[in-house]
Each structure stands twice: as structure tokens, then as C-alpha cells.
Design a protein with these regions (language model features):
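Terminal, low-structured helical/coil segments at or just beyond the last alpha-helical repeat
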Residues: 1-17, 247-289
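Register position in tetratricopeptide repeats
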Residues: 37-38, 71-72, 105-106, 139-140, ...
């Protein structure tokens, strides 16, 4: 039969067409994944888009495509791909958390709250959901609710340091200094060498008017990170309030010099995208390496 088909050009069977389509899909998808891992994001997106035209049901392919879109800065498209995955796997918490993460990068805090609501319906014990919810509330200017969400998360996991750090920062912003001090002190007792913790502690002390303590703590920040522009800039204010004009001038000069030498950090969405590129597939949704 195969000889006759070759001689007379017989049409391929449905099974043969399906097998060829599967082979084409696997090849294009593999090319896309390889390009993604080589950080050739535009090329990866083209291959993966083509692969989905051959098999729109492949959720793993959509996950890789969402990563490519994130790296390209096309967050709307990335979110759309994750949304399709979530529609197919409505009980997939990891995908919902990734959607919340992308919504955070887009600064779409309404979308974040919607996704977090869905996640809490699935698992009210997941502390990361409360953390994302708090970020969304902070973005919406609802500090009390953000603090409430973080308190819930910390109550469920006492060593959730990121949540306590964020809560301390929000409390500081709200001038709730005694409460912020509790978080800063707790964090300092548990992770004393952390730059962000030291910076929070110094800022709380500065806000409380404990200038001598704040000066020392800013010094510890600099020991951990000698290039912390914020630490130099803020310590200059502390030193000036202590009457140390010379020290304040030195800190101001150091901050100015570092600011001129180091490229200005990206802000907002651009910075969030950059951070995301450094942690592709953080939740290991499909566990592919």
C-alpha cells in the first residue's frame, strides 16, 4: 500500500497528518524553549506563538510564552496567557499567584485583588496570597487593609519575614511608629544582617527622633552595602540634626558621587520586569528545567 501511495501520490491518512502536526509542534515548541533559555525573547515568542497555532491546548507552551512576554515587557499578553491557563486549571494556585505577580508588575491593583480573592477561595491558608493582597491594597491606598492582610499572613506563619518587613514599612508610612518599631525589632533579632531590615530599623529610629541610634544603624546598612545611596542620603539628614555639618556634607557628597557613577535604577513597571527576568518561573508551575 505504501509503495502504491508513493507511485500514485496517494493522500495521507488522518493519522499521518496528525503525527506530522505533532512532530511540527514539538519541534517549534522546542525551538521556542531553547530561545527562551538563551534569552532570545523575541524569537522565543515567535516560535511559541507558532506552536500554539498548531496546538492551542498545550498549557506548558502558554506558560513559556508568558515568560517570554514578561521578559519583553509585554505584560498584558503575559497576563492573557496565564489567564487561559487558569481557565483550564481553575484550581491551580500557582498560576493564580503568578497572575497576581504580573498584575503587580502592571500596577493593576484591581486585577490583583480579583485574583487574590479567587486564590483565597481555593486556599485560605496560603500566606503568599495574603502578601500579594496586601501589596494590592497598598497600591490602592488602603493601608489599614494592607496591614490587616499582612497580620493575617504573619499569624499563619511567624517566620514570614517579607510580610513583616512590608507591614513595618507601611506602618512607618502611616506614622504608627511604635507598631513599626515592633516589626523592625523582631526582624533585627532574627535576621540582623539584612540590608532591608537595617534600613527599616534606621528609618523608624529616625522618625522617632532617636538620631544617635539611627546614625549607628545607618552605618550598619553601609557595612552590608557600601553603595546604599539611600543610607548615605538619609544619614546626612540625621547627622545634620545632630549638629555634625561636616559629616552630613560628607554623606551628601558620597550619595551624590554614587548617584553619578551608578546608572539610575529603573522605576515602576520597568524595574518590576527586570526583577522578574531574574527569576523565571518562580513557582515552578510545570517543573521543567
Amino acid at each position: 500500500m505504501n509503495i502504491l501511495k508513493k507511485l500514485f501520490g496517494g493522500q495521507k491518512t488522518t493519522e499521518e497528518v496528525r503525527e506530522m502536526k505533532e512532530k511540527d509542534f514539538d519541534k517549534v515548541k522546542y525551538d521556542g524553549v531553547r530561545a527562551l533559555r538563551m534569552h532570545q525573547f523575541d524569537l522565543a515568542a515567535k516560535f511559541l506563538e507558532q506552536a500554539l497555532q498548531l496546538n492551542a491546548e498545550d498549557l506548558e507552551c502558554r506558560d513559556y510564552l508568558s515568560q517570554a512576554y514578561i521578559s519583553m515587557g509585554d505584560l498584558q499578553q503575559a497576563y492573557a496567557q496565564l489567564q487561559k491557563i487558569s481557565e483550564a486549571q481553575s484550581d491551580n494556585m500557582a498560576v493564580l499567584l503568578r497572575m497576581a505577580d504580573v498584575a503587580y508588575m502592571m500596577e493593576d491593583y484591581i486585577a490583583m485583588t480579583d485574583v487574590c480573592d479567587k486564590a483565597l477561595q481555593l486556599d485560605a491558608e496560603n500566606v503568599e496570597t495574603y502578601f500579594f493582597y496586601a501589596r494590592a491594597c497598598r497600591g490602592l491606598g488602603d493601608a489599614p487593609r494592607a496591614v490587616s492582610m499582612l497580620t493575617e499572613a504573619i499569624g499563619k506563619r511567624g517566620d514570614f519575614y517579607a510580610a513583616r518587613l512590608l507591614r513595618g514599612s507601611i506602618l512607618l508610612d502611616q506614622a504608627q511608629l511604635s507598631e513599626a518599631e515592633l516589626d523592625a525589632t523582631f526582624l533585627y533579632e532574627h535576621i540582623p544582617g539584612n540590608e532591608d531590615v537595617l534600613l527599616l530599623k534606621a528609618r523608624v529610629e529616625k522618625a522617632q527622633g532617636k538620631m544617635e541610634e539611627a546614625e549607628q544603624t545607618y552605618g550598619k546598612v553601609m557595612e552590608v552595602n557600601p553603595f546604599s545611596i539611600d543610607a548615605y542620603r538619609e544619614r546626612s539628614e540625621v547627622r545634620r540634626s545632630l549638629g555634625d555639618s561636616g559629616g552630613a556634607a560628607e554623606d551628601e557628597a558620597a550619595a551624590k558621587e554614587m548617584g553619578a557613577e551608578i546608572p539610575e535604577p529603573s522605576e515602576g513597571i520597568e524595574q518590576k520586569i527586570k526583577e522578574k527576568m531574574q527569576q523565571m518561573d518562580p513557582y515552578k508551575v510545570f517543573h521543567n528545567e
